């Protein structure tokens, strides 16, 4: 029987053919957690009386939400996790100088056809390379760490096809917001989105990571880009080996299909206070902004920083602007390419890979009555600080243009 990518991955992981609606136990290929959720995972393991790790090579731990620790409790939590790492001899541990977990996963670990679970909702980012990646609660992740297994209800497969080439200032965020605007945030519950790209080079891995990252904002059980030449090239270049490709059968059946012509996309913005309150940038243009944030595991990659640097080169920002590359590896690359210098000369504050203001943690949280535009993933009340702040979401081009003018600006006008 023809299988979708979802069905192929979960059939392999369960050891039997599965269909949408089946509830089955599956083996996981990778498990991960970060500082904010990791100590809960460890507490669950301690409660059941074991610190056993099913395979130390398949557990990835990164400090990102509380990096560097902004308070004593955060430092204490990180100390507890470091002790766990020492006791279990887990080799894949990334301390505060490494970056955001989800970026580390796609840089170093995630492969097509894998099952990945982690204690964070944006685990879906690894779907960029064609992995079935889900965020789970601490108890389920603890069970996966101990046993190497979890359970899943096989989701309904939904096919999305991207065709055409995006215009100059269009980014993966615009693709994600287009889907959210057309379907709303609760539409894809119980579904797995499989995205096909007709011209693979038109949607680079950075764009794919952004869209996959926001799969959870679409309420999808998983979001995966079907592996293609872009996937192959990315992994071979980044890691030096040729990945094993897993793709759906050509005659596989989907619950529904949806096409996007990338050449017709305009820069989009999610207005307060919901990710699916999507508008063309022209509809909100001119809105005064107190702070701009360019970064996060959603839009803190090289192409994002490149867009911002091109817009800000030789100019000065008119409002507070914070730039945070998603990993230390990306920070060094941006430094090498001159983007850090360009952004610093423009007046931006730049730091290394950390979640920071995205979750209202530190490094620039929003104050009462302030208006923020951010390239991160969520804009509900209180997400980035004060519940009295307003957060707009956009891609890096709109964010950088806004920093330049001090008000929401269409980058095509510059």
Swiss-Prot record:
<comment type="function">
    <text>Catalyzes the isomerization between 2-isopropylmalate and 3-isopropylmalate, via the formation of 2-isopropylmaleate.</text>
</comment>
<dbReference type="Pfam" id="PF00330">
    <property type="entry name" value="Aconitase"/>
</dbReference>
<keyword id="KW-0004">4Fe-4S</keyword>
<protein>
    <recommendedName>
        <fullName>3-isopropylmalate dehydratase large subunit</fullName>
        <ecNumber>4.2.1.33</ecNumber>
    </recommendedName>
</protein>
<comment type="pathway">
    <text>Amino-acid biosynthesis; L-leucine biosynthesis; L-leucine from 3-methyl-2-oxobutanoate: step 2/4.</text>
</comment>
<dbReference type="InterPro" id="IPR011826">
    <property type="entry name" value="HAcnase/IPMdehydase_lsu_prok"/>
</dbReference>
<dbReference type="GO" id="GO:0009098">
    <property type="term" value="P:L-leucine biosynthetic process"/>
</dbReference>
<comment type="subunit">
    <text>Heterodimer of LeuC and LeuD.</text>
</comment>
<dbReference type="GO" id="GO:0046872">
    <property type="term" value="F:metal ion binding"/>
</dbReference>
<dbReference type="InterPro" id="IPR006251">
    <property type="entry name" value="Homoacnase/IPMdehydase_lsu"/>
</dbReference>
<keyword id="KW-0411">Iron-sulfur</keyword>
<feature type="binding site">
    <location>
        <position position="358"/>
    </location>
    <ligand>
        <name>[4Fe-4S] cluster</name>
    </ligand>
</feature>
<dbReference type="InterPro" id="IPR015931">
    <property type="entry name" value="Acnase/IPM_dHydase_lsu_aba_1/3"/>
</dbReference>
<keyword id="KW-0028">Amino-acid biosynthesis</keyword>
<keyword id="KW-0432">Leucine biosynthesis</keyword>
<feature type="binding site">
    <location>
        <position position="355"/>
    </location>
    <ligand>
        <name>[4Fe-4S] cluster</name>
    </ligand>
</feature>
<keyword id="KW-0100">Branched-chain amino acid biosynthesis</keyword>
<feature type="binding site">
    <location>
        <position position="297"/>
    </location>
    <ligand>
        <name>[4Fe-4S] cluster</name>
    </ligand>
</feature>
<dbReference type="InterPro" id="IPR036008">
    <property type="entry name" value="Aconitase_4Fe-4S_dom"/>
</dbReference>
<dbReference type="GO" id="GO:0051539">
    <property type="term" value="F:4 iron, 4 sulfur cluster binding"/>
</dbReference>
<keyword id="KW-0408">Iron</keyword>
<keyword id="KW-0456">Lyase</keyword>
<dbReference type="GO" id="GO:0003861">
    <property type="term" value="F:3-isopropylmalate dehydratase activity"/>
</dbReference>
<dbReference type="InterPro" id="IPR001030">
    <property type="entry name" value="Acoase/IPM_deHydtase_lsu_aba"/>
</dbReference>
<dbReference type="InterPro" id="IPR033941">
    <property type="entry name" value="IPMI_cat"/>
</dbReference>
<dbReference type="InterPro" id="IPR050067">
    <property type="entry name" value="IPM_dehydratase_rel_enz"/>
</dbReference>
<dbReference type="InterPro" id="IPR018136">
    <property type="entry name" value="Aconitase_4Fe-4S_BS"/>
</dbReference>
<keyword id="KW-0479">Metal-binding</keyword>
<comment type="similarity">
    <text>Belongs to the aconitase/IPM isomerase family. LeuC type 2 subfamily.</text>
</comment>
